[in-house]
Amino acid sequence: MPEDALDNVTSSLHDVVVVGAGPSGASCAHWLADAGWDVVVVEKKSLPREKTCGDGLTPRAVRQLADMGLEPLVAAAGHRYEGLRAVGFGRELELSWPEHPNFPPYGYTITRFDLDAIIAESARQQGARVLYGTEAVEPFEAMPPVREGRLGSASGVTVRDVATGRTAEVRARYVVIADGANSRLGRTLGAARRRDWPMGMALRGYWRSPRHDDRFIESHIDIRDANGDVVPGYGWIFPLGDGRVNVGVGLLSTDRTWRGVNTTRLMDAFLAQADPSWELSESTCLGPATGGKLPMGLSVGPCLGDNVVLTGDAAGAINPFNGEGIAYGYETGRLAATSVATALERGDADALEGYSDRLSSSYGEYFRVARGFVRLISEPKVMQACVGVGMRSDWLMSRLLSIMANLLRPDDLGSAELGYRAINAIAKRVPDGALDAVLAALDDRAPAVASSRG
């Protein structure tokens, strides 16, 4: 980063400083800058850069990209696909994305190497100043929370030039924390993850494949070892359209054996059962797999302080149903931008309260249902009974896809919408912790559950 670039942003008070140029940070900066506010984005890495991800964009993400005017760029750099191929329990179903008044019936696959650079550049073109190679070290002039259930506040962030080690302060009226799943700034100001809520763990790599331009992304619901026994986890193969496929495995902390699972062995088991036509072998592998853990279901909080908001992965804004985070990064970044802009327009920080309300109304009930669902299907007997039976019906799995991808129609009480309402009505009456007792009763290893659960 040129030295004068840091000088230019440290000499004045800005409207907003956004920490992180990933999906939520770049989205927030795009919308704030588009509205004419003085925005500075600090990003530790230099974009483009590699980022561990499944590289899949659902119709929800495409809608946000279209609203930003960026779908043509993503379409040119990525690969369009039409739906999900579900594989499991001896069956294979091709499920097209549902027709929806607000979302397109297709998605894209595109590497985060390309995608994140497109969004960050868009924020810059809207007028945001984006400082690459600049690490946010700590909140500047941090103050403790004024009341329980709130984050602390800050007058900006102290940053460090990664290349030179020089430090400086970027001062701003509002601070948006979008620094990812391991949010250091969020923790410093009082954010913490609810450890009894789902945490995802995933591993992914790239392979050359003759099916790189397949029209469906593929999800494997059950993975089996060499003996045919079910092992905890799920797998995916996402065609990228450029000669490569993104291949990965995932696991949720709701599975009682997750701490003892070796993800490399899980990947090996998945590769062994993938259809040979994908040609996933040691000779077609393009490098070592990488992975990480992701908080889900808005499991991180508080998300709001006097002049601070948490957004995207930093807030745990990942769908527990399917592990999707990019769409919710764009959406929560936009929600944060709306709330911050309102506070700036009114000259009243109390207007920031709308952010919590917007998160709750947008995702509160849905993520609650999702948390209950993933708890249940982590029990093999429930998985066999529910998903195993569901795989016998294209009709049923198509409805389940609408629910899991959060693509329920607001204007129609169809079978998927009615099914979700019924599940939601039940979930409202069952406390999160109550499911643990039910699962323990189903588990032959019930006495060991309490001691193994974190």
Regions found by a protein language model. Name each.
Residues 8-22:
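Beta1/beta-strand and adjacent pyrophosphate-binding region of the FAD-binding site
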Residues 25-26:
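N-terminal Rossmann-fold NAD(P) dinucleotide-binding loop
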Residues 33-53:
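Glycine-rich FAD pyrophosphate-binding loop
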Residues 46-66:
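Conserved N-terminal glycine-rich FAD pyrophosphate-binding loop of Rossmann-like flavoproteins
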Residues 62, 67-116:
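A conserved beta-strand/loop capping segment in the N-terminal third of enzymes
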Residues 122-278:
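Predominantly flavin-linked oxidoreductase catalytic cores and closely associated redox partners
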Residues 255-339, 345:
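FAD/FMN-dependent oxidoreductases across multiple families
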Residues 341-454:
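C-terminal helical "tail/cap" subdomain of flavin- and related membrane-associated enzymes
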